[in-house]
């Protein structure tokens, strides 16, 4: 009987599974790839948006240390012009590139040759290895996107030789500063200095560096490939390491991962923005389209990337093109991104919790429209995900509808079918449909939840300008064409000897709507003769390389301009408030118990509301006035006081300079009335409508005498209130 054979020996350790025995965990081949464009080279490769013109590659088998055939292929570029740097480094010409194959043909040849070389070296999987990330992320993927080419799967993962080298030799310079020459020099490799074929020397040197690194024992070498996302992931933005159901305003976003894109077409979507940054890894839901005050897109977007290296590459796409428009790319902060994309509503969180959904925005819905109406409008051919659960209506804080809504669709085809309903009729209104994003949903909901787009302002401080003495004599001069930087000292120097004839508080600078100097000024002189002499002496004199017109005018004309009217060569137009009085009214102050009023309180309420209840006119009657800073809040001019120099800053009633009392009117309007502000008045309301509201509160005709300044003609009961109404 034959004895049974001895049992087989136990299997030994697999060399592929033992890191100490095999320094390369990657089980396949490496395809060393080098490329160049018609523009910038090196670290700036792809920053000028030029086309690819050259590909050089060679296959390396890490375990057997075998290498395949070196291949070189030219690529025809749409723009035949070569930069000086490229022409000197490569030695190529426009004629040689014109005879080359286009990019799609070259990529087909590349795949066929790589598969053949890998099969000769033993077969198995393979992965690209490049010098840096610019070739794939900044050149190949953006160009393929512009030309609508579909890249094979091999171009979506690769090894960065710089990063692998820096992992083995961290004491060298940062990975982004490494080059093929510095890596070879750091390893002490001898390179072929006689090789002058552009791209061939780089590939041969990269292969030598890889083979030298494989001799060093390491379990990390070629273990973590770089991955390029094939598509942009929509949905609520979340941290790539700590997923969350939705983006919250409490989230902290690294500012080194955010950029701002400006100049986007208004109809562009988040997918269009992600396509502009093709080749870079945008974080999930990382495209936040910005809206203006009216809730419409303003052509800007904030984009969040997965790391700072992707952000630095995105900044190199500054002024690259989206269609025919160039897009500006700047740095942004994480706080700005959270402000746009973050939210706090649980309703929005539940709405955005569904992944891989296409969001559309519906605008212009009837206020009475409900979920059933919207679903009927879209029709059965484009069903909403979850039915009524896939609709989100935007409402005011009090629950009133805004006419906006968002809808979720399961795929791009259903969204395209829904977009064909753009400007379709629902009832008597046409509905607009747009692509939207999770960040836009957050923005719109946050905007309406935080209050109206145009909030109601608090009652402003109503300043009382310095009183202007009535009169029709032309005792004032108008300076036109002043430099915007002109100061009161410049005006006094410009007038020269005539500055001695200026009245106290007699220089008035006219400001524009933004509170900046308009180039005009009015000066009150002591008499009409002095004003005429100053105009004749100073007309068209030069101040800071500009000639200034000096013309005489009356106090009435000056008052109209300072209160908002205009004075031109064709005549004088009244101010917007249509007040019949020719000069700002003046008011009396009243003696009362001294009271300390906080500055914040005085800045929010009219001064009449801060006065004590008991108001007894004092004698003699002083003139009350507001300082310049308070005047700027309401009127379009600033009064300066050259003699004596006074610059009060306290808000409220101040003691009037003694010199001002001489020019004040002898009788002023008493404070026996009250000022009423009406909000919510219909646009069609007229003067009679407003007077009818206060019909029961009119004063007897005899009481108007004490309320009118001296010199006003007698007025009837129906005429008097009209002049105190400002529309």
From Swiss-Prot:
It comes from Homo sapiens (Human). Its main location: nucleus. Induction: Down-regulated during the epithelial-to-mesenchymal transition (EMT). Belongs to the ESRP family. Keywords: mRNA processing, mRNA splicing, Nucleus, Phosphoprotein, Repeat, RNA-binding. GO terms for molecular function: mRNA binding; RNA binding. This is Epithelial splicing regulatory protein 2. PANTHER family: HETEROGENEOUS NUCLEAR RIBONUCLEOPROTEIN-RELATED. InterPro entries: ESRP (IPR050666), Nucleotide-bd_a/b_plait_sf (IPR012677), RBD_domain_sf (IPR035979), RNaseH-like_sf (IPR012337), RNaseH_sf (IPR036397), RRM_dom (IPR000504). Epithelial cell-specific. One of its GO terms (cellular component) is ribonucleoprotein complex.
